[in-house]
A protein has these predicted regions:
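Nucleic-acid endo/exonuclease domains
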Residues: 1-134
């Protein structure tokens, strides 16, 4: 019986966070480490018969972070089907995070590469908002 449950979509796949981080995700992870913020990678949230994974979960703050790379979420030309699926997945994640009581912070590749200090300010600001609510 255990094998069936473990292999089903009732439980999130194991060891998901062992997927290598992208360079952009590594930048955010390093920032979170520098800020001494405890986080987990690839936070699963149940959606219908499957799971949606969020890049980072700030454990003590109820904040999820998605790092949006330029290819999938940016201005680069891409097939309309790819753009449509990325937009649909983003909308689902936005809704799911809100439904589950998380604040979702989206960080664009351009922000990380061109204005890194703003990323630090955004994350710190959301943490401070969360602390003032509690």
């Amino acid at each position: 019986m255990k094998a069936k449950i473990r292999g089903s979509s009732l439980l999130p796949p194991r060891n998901r966070s062992r997927r290598p981080m992208t360079d952009l995700e590594q930048m955010v992870a390093d920032l979170l480490d520098d800020l001494k913020i405890e986080f987990e990678r690839e936070k699963p949230l149940k959606y219908l018969q499957g799971w949606r994974y969020f890049d980072f979960h700030l454990i003590e703050h109820g904040i999820l972070i998605e790092v949006d790379g330029a290819y999938w979420h940016g201005d680069n030309p891409k097939p309309s089907y790819v753009a449509m699926m990325a937009k649909k997945n983003d909308m689902i994640k936005n809704w799911l995070a809100k439904k589950e009581g998380y604040k979702l912070v989206r960080i664009k590749e351009k922000q990380l590469k061109e204005d890194f200090s703003s990323v630090k300010n955004i994350i710190s600001g959301e943490i401070n908002k969360n602390l003032s609510r509690n």
